[in-house]
Amino acid sequence: MAISTPMLVTFCVYIFGMILIGFIAWRSTKNFDDYILGGRSLGPFVTALSAGASDMSGWLLMGLPGAVFLSGISESWIAIGLTLGAWINWKLVAGRLRVHTEYNNNALTLPDYFTGRFEDKSRILRIISALVILLFFTIYCASGIVAGARLFESTFGMSYETALWAGAAATILYTFIGGFLAVSWTDTVQASLMIFALILTPVIVIISVGGFGDSLEVIKQKSIENVDMLKGLNFVAIISLMGWGLGYFGQPHILARFMAADSHHSIVHARRISMTWMILCLAGAVAVGFFGIAYFNEHPAVAGAVNQNAERVFIELAQILFNPWIAGILLSAILAAVMSTLSCQLLVCSSAITEDLYKAFLRKQASQKELVWVGRVMVLVVALVAIALAANPENRVLGLVSYAWAGFGAAFGPVVLFSVMWSRMTRNGALAGMIIGALTVIVWKQFGWLGLYEIIPGFIFGSIGIVVFSLLGKAPSAAMQKRFADADAHYHSAPPSRLQEG
């Protein structure tokens, strides 16, 4: 469908607004701490929505609705698993990680935190974790660029190659300029846009088909299996879909939001906001795909694009059902989802190179200004590599994301979880858990044993590795155990009263 002038104007205004926020954030970025973690100044609202937006990539508006459109409501198991995993992550990890990173050399990155938490003088933990971030996040960034390119290709009628660069340019620019504050502030705007799109679209789809009851009847008539939660699924398949929730414990771009909160006490409010946002967005995404079945069954003349590529179901519904101004806003939500996640991932990759490799091994005495500019250059370098990986237009967003999600979940998830919950954990345990988790994902992905999603064996074997190697070796030093105890006591301390705050 050809792009209209109102849609073009809406897109341009949106993109310009994101870049403007980047320039505003640039004025608040005074040092590398500001560029990477925003000076740990995020309040609960920004923490919540930026964590949500950075988590839900283009997959939320393309991959998930497309999967439900193809297979029916049974694909919603993945949304249930994600919701449970996110809630547990907020409950167990978020506040603790905020405190423990501060107690361990005021760590700015996960590799930096692991090095301080386990007194790793060899710095092998820093190297391995930084390399794991670069490997899996480059794949993750590529998936975001593919999603953005598809949007530009479909909406503007561009060639895929042109769309590839157009879709990534604005994100790279505001991330390059403004760093973490730009990313977090734009994430908040983008999260608001995403929830608006995912609530409005399924409501209009249902109305256009004749109401909820009529829509459900049409879906059942096409195939009764569309409303069967267990359609074609055995125990392994359900566990694999639910297993996506395990990934939350190890996603650096989400964990960075916890680390950047202004206080661990504000995490409680952030959790409530974030989980409400997440449940509404996931329900909306499932509803788009589910009721999209009814709409395109009733209107087969316009179903050609979604029958060719189910991931376009949201795009097609937005363009068909809404006037061009509203359609432009709704399609901007896909760009918002892509940009919010891509910008966070670019920044995490940049920080891994700058803080954990460049500063740690090449320029220990580098000035803050130098580190900020190295960080900016690394944003460009990682983006170019990701664009090269995304050059094949046949890539499937869900497939790429599932691999990267599993990689982080298994390599970092058990290490992060045990590091904030178990004082007996050692450097060797962390190293074993990281290596075993990552290797299990890579090997399991290649062989596809039992049809089980690779994050599950990766998480299990990684956790076992942590416990076994921690107990086999020497106990943590007295200083390490005291630091853990102090951080844990701080985490459990009561929040200041209003009188104390005032």
For each predicted feature, which ranges?
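Membrane-embedded helix-loop-helix hairpins and adjacent transmembrane boundary segments
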Residues: 1-502
